[in-house]
C-alpha cells in the first residue's frame, strides 16, 4: 500500500527523518519517519516518501512522485513525475526511468507524462532502463542493464535489451524451479509457489 501523510517537511526543526546537510528538500512534501536522505540529493515539492526509506547520493525525486515504505534508492537515480513505487522496492545504482514516449527539446510535452508503477517488493538492477508507460509487477526482478519496453508480470525475472523473461523469482529473490506439477519452493524461505496459466502465485505462507 502507498503511504499516507506522515510528516510534513515544512518545519525542519521538527523533522522525523534524516537529511544530510547537502541534500535539498523543497516544500511542501511528505516524508515518513526514519527515512534517510543522503549527500547532494534533491526532493522536489509535492512528493510523498514513506517510512524507513533510504535515498542515496545524487538522487533526484521529481514533483508528485510517490514512494512507499522501506524503498531503497541507490546512488545516481532520477525518479520522474508519473512514477509510483509500492513498499519494499529496490532501485539499483544509476537505473533510469523515463516519462515521455517521444521527447523533443523544442516541444513541451509536460502534459503528456506517462505513468509507471513499480509493485511491492520489486527490484530493478543497476543501469536498467524502464521505458515509461510500463508497469513492473510485485516482486519482479529486473536484471542489471535491462531495457524494459513492456509491462512485467509479478515474480518475473527479466534481462537484456530489450528485456526478455528468463524465468520466475520468489519474494526472497531466488530463482524458482517448478516441477512437473507446477510447484516450486524458495530455498531460503521455504515458501511454496504455483505456476499456472503463465502466472505465479503463493500457495503457502
Predicted features along the sequence, with ranges:
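Flexible, glycine/small-residue-enriched loop-and-beta-strand segment within the central core
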Residues: 15-21, 27-29, 36-135, 167
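Short-chain dehydrogenase/reductase
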Residues: 54, 123, 141, 157-159
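Short, intrinsically disordered, charge-biased short linear motifs at domain edges
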Residues: 154-160, 169-178
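Cys/His-enriched microdomains
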Residues: 165-168, 184
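Short cysteine-rich clusters marking metal-coordination/redox-active sites
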Residues: 170, 186-189
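Short, non-ligating residues that shape and space the ligands of small metal-coordination modules
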Residues: 178-179, 194-196
